[in-house]
Amino acid sequence: MSKSTAEIRQAFLDFFHSKGHQVVASSSLVPNNDPTLLFTNAGMNQFKDVFLGLDKRNYSRATTSQRCVRAGGKHNDLENVGYTARHHTFFEMLGNFSFGDYFKHDAIQYAWELLTGENWFNLPKERLWVTVYETDDEAYEIWEKEVGIPRERIIRIGDNKGAPYASDNFWQMGDTGPCGPCTEIFYDHGDHIWGGPPGTAEEDGDRYIEIWNIVFMQFNRQIDGTMEPLPKPSVDTGMGLERIAAVLQHVNSNYDIDLFSTLIKSVAEVTGATDLSNKSLRVIADHIRSCAFLIADGVIPSNENRGYVLRRIIRRAVRHGNMLGAKDTFFYKLVGPLVGVMGDAGEELKRQQSQVEQVLKTEEEQFARTLERGLALLDEELSQLTGDTLDGETAFRLYDTYGFPVDLTADVCRERNIKVDEAGFEAAMEEQRRRARESSGFGADYNAMIRVDSASEFQGYDRLELNAKVTALFVDGKAVDSISAGQDAVVVLDKTPFYAESGGQVGDKGELKGNGFSFAVSDTQKYGQAIGHIGKLASGSLKVGEGVQAEVDEARRERIRLNHSATHLMHAALRDVLGTHVAQKGSLVNDKILRFDFSHFEAMKPSEIRAVEDMVNAQIRRNLPIETNIMDLEAARAKGAMALFGEKYDERVRVLSMGDFSTELCGGTHASRTGDIGLFRILSESGTAAGVRRIEAVTGEGAIASLHAESDQLHDIAQLLKGDSHNLGEKVRSALERSRQLEKELQQLKEQAAVQESANLSSKAVDIKGVKLLVSELAGVEPKMLRTMVDDLKNQLGSTIIVLATAVDGKVSLIAGVSKDVTDRVKAGELIGMVAQQVGGKGGGRPDMAQAGGTDAAALPAALASVESWVSAKL
């Protein structure tokens, strides 16, 4: 009986644990120690700094089963997923690692024992082939003389990629740094499958499959390309769980292993598919794994960075579900089955299951609204295509209008052997960016043209005034030697207490003054390494080289400090209340409010807003110390400091901590203790884009002012309702109930009036060939009452044709009613269409009742006058 995928994973970890390895949990799919990496894509990612000597662990041997995603950037397998036997967006990498401990001998012996040992994987030895780097005689001899593999099954691979050390069997972390030869182990599925051994012309076949790569990090590559031996060589290995499961379960495709077989059946169940060999089932089964685990690790669908990759994968899965005939949202229903097949490796996913399902369902519902229309447009374009390439402009229109990622369009085209002009798509995308840049300008911003060679030293963390020297002056973006009273200018100082706008915090205001002059600073901005004070010279004159006294508006700075510190508390509270997927997407901190944009998939519930507000105020009452430390970027990350993805940081960073509650990288100005904030109140929560929410809040005096404003408003409402704050709710409910009752009575009166009006109108009907025709424009009648009147008139008149109209504020409402015995000759829909066309509108309906609207009230009398002749012709 073959092992299950879960048993194989556990056996691997157990084996290396028995060899003295520390079992280390899988790290997040979102790398926390490498901002250049989109997703964790290898087992060694979490140990990168250990290999580089920047981090130390209390163990020298480790083993993991690491979750990995390859669906963006350099490692992009997306287009092949579902169509080949082994490509996935998500996979698990089994690995064992030595940090300066054992090396080639033990690494090879461990691998052989696990693969062929009777108590472990027990693979037939004659089915295993190995490759080594061409000059790695040591590894070759271990395989041949110690392990006993025949020479014909050991293959040397040289520099087969066109440069020294550029080889399938030489691993490099980058252009410089740790590197070394590797040995790979292949499994021979047998001669009934096409393919040749590695290094031969047929190596891309499916007969010989790489199952394990063992990297020997023994060199440090220098910038000039020379290789220096590492003092402590290390080992990094990787074996795809899905691949070894296919071997041990005696199947040729990863999609036939137990884990995927179960998922594919679940996909068929939720989509209604019956053909289990359909490749769309494989696509969806793969994609639910990457999507669910990415969301569990904090990624939310969006239009940028990791969120956009996730959105692309979700939409590809939804489109394949559509191809299978899925009528309703289905993708989120696969999270439960996924949790079931992942076993112990899915514990974190199980904890977040409901949240992951909600994110997937929301995203699927949003895309479903445009999917059908987008596919129809694409089908139309492809049906008219003369060549074999879809133009980039059309692909861009699908992206821009219907949210189709270009690779989804390429997926559809691929099924019809059509290519997509991706270069043309990129050109159209760049043109849109250019137009956006141009349309965002509201006139010349001369200050944006300022170029300053000098640097300014910011000293405003600890002081709000100091003496400085003017190093540059700019007027309308041009450098000048001096300015005079009344001139707008930018003043650059050698040092300053003024904070320049950065990280969402606005620039300081204040005054620069000196001997006979005063310069009012209205804003402060960065110009490269210089800090510019923007404002107007109120009096006197000022020249380059002159000394000034720089004074920041202290009261304004204090309010900004409180708001900025509250923003950090709120960020931490949001992650606690909503989940760790919450990430900052933008912020504004000024002296009046704080505004914070963050990733979240739905509007916050009132209870969640209250929980965040209460949590922040609880931290304020704790009066936590707010401390800053300058440290290495790596040390800051190790401390758990939150950083923004895509943001570039210096090697030395400023870490802001608020007790044990919040730690972030931040260069802004802050309160001394959380208690200084006083009070925190959320004013609003709203959406700004798909997957992005916005909170606006106030602190301190602003929070108290908002409480007073609400109290005053409640007092005014209470007086209007002749009540007080204690019974206000009861008074409002009573007033609303009374209002509903009065509206009901008013509606009844209107209906009675309509019936009376109908009785008066019936006498105005004329007889045309035995059918009563009534055409009338009614003044002061609500449009919705016309239908009631037509029904009543039809009962009164018998065989009849009725057209009623009313005009309110220039808008025309029309209705036509035809008794059923006349509809074979006159149809209400045709009649109302004829009238509506004359008043600038259109409409339709059933043969016996139809409604329309129009915009040309002046044309209504003539339109109604045309009805009699039109009806006569029909009868």
UniProtKB/Swiss-Prot annotation:
CDD domains: AlaRS_core (cd00673)
Function: Catalyzes the attachment of alanine to tRNA(Ala) in a two-step reaction: alanine is first activated by ATP to form Ala-AMP and then transferred to the acceptor end of tRNA(Ala). Also edits incorrectly charged Ser-tRNA(Ala) and Gly-tRNA(Ala) via its editing domain.
Enzyme class, first EC level, given as a word: ligase
GO molecular function, one term: ATP binding
UniProt KW Zinc keyword: yes
GO CC, any one term: cytosol
Alphabetical list of HAMAP family matching this protein: Ala_tRNA_synth_B
Family classification: Belongs to the class-II aminoacyl-tRNA synthetase family.
Catalysed reactions, as listed in the record: tRNA(Ala) + L-alanine + ATP = L-alanyl-tRNA(Ala) + AMP + diphosphate
Name of this chain's protein: Alanine--tRNA ligase
Cofactor note: Binds 1 zinc ion per subunit.
Keywords annotated in UniProt: Aminoacyl-tRNA synthetase, ATP-binding, Cytoplasm, Ligase, Metal-binding, Nucleotide-binding, Protein biosynthesis, RNA-binding, tRNA-binding, Zinc
Domain observations: Consists of three domains; the N-terminal catalytic domain, the editing domain and the C-terminal C-Ala domain. The editing domain removes incorrectly charged amino acids, while the C-Ala domain, along with tRNA(Ala), serves as a bridge to cooperatively bring together the editing and aminoacylation centers thus stimulating deacylation of misacylated tRNAs.
Names of required cofactors: Zn(2+)
GO biological process, one term: negative regulation of DNA-templated transcription
Top-level lineage group: Bacteria
Keyword flag RNA-binding: yes
